[in-house]
A protein has these predicted regions:
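Phosphate/pyrophosphate-binding loops at sites that engage ATP/ADP/AMP, CoA/4′-phosphopantetheine
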Residues: 1-2, 26, 162-166
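Alpha-helix initiation/capping motif
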Residues: 12, 26-29, 160-161
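Beta-strand segments within the central parallel beta-sheet cores of soluble alpha/beta enzyme folds
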Residues: 1-10, 29-37, 64-74
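Conserved beta-strand-centric core segments of catalytic alpha/beta enzyme folds
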Residues: 14-18, 40-192
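Flexible glycine/proline-rich, aromatic-decorated loop/lid segments
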Residues: 17-39
Length: 192
């Protein structure tokens, strides 16, 4: 609530939706979700978007002394996150960068996580997925799923046009199927 301006990284709608959910923001937040207009629309080079969002944020903060702004960034498959809180108000107190991250890493390492198998077999369901496209259209699906016992796995779909069409036009989350290995890779076959 102390943040006056927000710029959520916006490479895809899902990146904005995930950030909104994690920050408990509503799509009609009166502060807006971007100070630039969003990555596809701001008029600058895409590979320097966050630099531009920070620069735009600084202009807003300098025009409204004492306010705060949040700019976020992410990369890869939304697995690398960055966030910055900015203000024209000087920092008060002593700032120290953490030099020993051992305790933090130990806490992360001890968090409960599912077992993982590289050779899944049997009935399974989709936990999350994406569709890889080529110039000709959908090429294959990538599935992160769970076996019946909760073990997590990674698999591809076959290059079956009907499966890919189904994946493009339906929500595959929690879809049941069967997963097996063909010796080179894991294959998930949904039950449609």
């Amino acid at each position: 609530n102390q943040v006056n301006y927000i710029d959520l990284y916006s490479c895809f709608p899902s990146a904005v939706q995930i950030a909104m959910r994690e920050l408990s923001l509503q799509k009609d937040d009166l502060r807006g979700l971007t100070v630039t207009g969003g990555l596809p629309y701001f008029g600058g080079p895409g590979n320097a978007y966050v630099m531009n969002s920070i620069a735009t944020m600084m202009d807003k903060l300098r025009s409204n002394r004492g306010t705060f702004g949040l700019a976020t960034a992410n990369g890869w498959y939304i697995t690398k996150h960055g966030a910055g809180i900015f203000s024209s108000k000087p920092f008060e107190g002593e700032w120290n960068q953490a030099t020993d991250t051992t305790q933090l890493q130990t806490k992360i390492d001890s968090a409960k996580k599912p077992n993982f198998t590289e050779s899944p077999q049997g009935k399974a369901s989709v936990e999350t997925y994406t569709i890889v496209h080529s110039r000709e259209g959908p090429n294959k699906g990538i599935i992160i799923g769970r076996l019946e016992d909760g073990t997590r796995f990674l698999a591809n779909t076959e290059k079956d046009p009907s499966v890919l069409d189904y994946m493009c036009n339906n929500d595959m989350l929690k879809t049941s199927g069967v997963v097996s290995t063909d010796g080179k890779r894991n294959i998930f076959k949904p039950i449609q």
